[in-house]
């Protein structure tokens, strides 16, 4: 399932079909947020059922918002700058996603740090994709 979703994202050329890219990044981030929420609710049980539902929604929708902002920013940046395969587009998208997280938490420090870290991580992922880096190499038998 996961490789299919990631392939769906990478198969769309940067700077085109921004709505499909945003949908893909939103769905990936939503699953990540739902997973984090499941761990949070399991390891730190809420007092009531409604508190648990609220925490799951908070984690899931925050992650979905970060993913949507990332997808839209990278795509629009690639389209406006007319440089589709530039890691700077991904830095801008990661930074915008980090700023969204900071706005959600009402904390400038978290927003600034997340901007830098998400931007660097997204740029490295794009550089690795362009240069063919293998994160998990297949074993040679």
From Swiss-Prot:
Keyword Membrane on entry: yes
Example of a GO biological process term: mitochondrial electron transport, NADH to ubiquinone
Residues that span the membrane, as ranges: 21-43, 58-80
Location (main, coarse): mitochondrion
Gene Ontology cellular-component annotations: mitochondrial inner membrane; respiratory chain complex I
Subcellular location: Mitochondrion inner membrane
InterPro entries named in the record: NDUFA11
UniProt modified residues of type N-acetylalanine: 2
Keyword Ribonucleoprotein: no
Bilayer topology term: Multi-pass membrane protein
Assigned keywords, A-Z: Acetylation, Electron transport, Membrane, Mitochondrion, Mitochondrion inner membrane, Respiratory chain, Transmembrane, Transmembrane helix, Transport
Binding partners and assembly: Complex I is composed of 45 different subunits.
Function statement: Accessory subunit of the mitochondrial membrane respiratory chain NADH dehydrogenase (Complex I), that is believed not to be involved in catalysis. Complex I functions in the transfer of electrons from NADH to the respiratory chain. The immediate electron acceptor for the enzyme is believed to be ubiquinone.
Similarity remark: Belongs to the complex I NDUFA11 subunit family.
Protein name: NADH dehydrogenase [ubiquinone] 1 alpha subcomplex subunit 11
Organism from which the protein derives: Gorilla gorilla gorilla
């Amino acid at each position: 399932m996961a490789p299919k979703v990631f392939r769906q994202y990478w198969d769309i050329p940067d700077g085109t079909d921004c709505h499909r890219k945003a949908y893909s990044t939103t769905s990936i981030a939503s699953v990540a947020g739902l997973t984090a929420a499941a761990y949070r609710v399991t390891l730190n049980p809420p007092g009531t059922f409604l508190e648990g539902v609220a925490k799951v929604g908070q984690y899931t929708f925050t992650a979905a918002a970060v993913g949507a902002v990332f997808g839209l920013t990278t795509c629009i940046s690639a389209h406006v700058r007319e440089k589709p395969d530039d890691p700077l587009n991904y830095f801008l998208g990661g930074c915008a996603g980090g700023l969204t997280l900071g706005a959600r938490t009402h904390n400038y420090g978290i927003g600034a740090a997340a901007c830098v870290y998400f931007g660097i991580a997204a740029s490295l992922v794009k550089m690795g994709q362009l240069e063919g880096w293998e994160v998990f190499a297949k074993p040679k038998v």
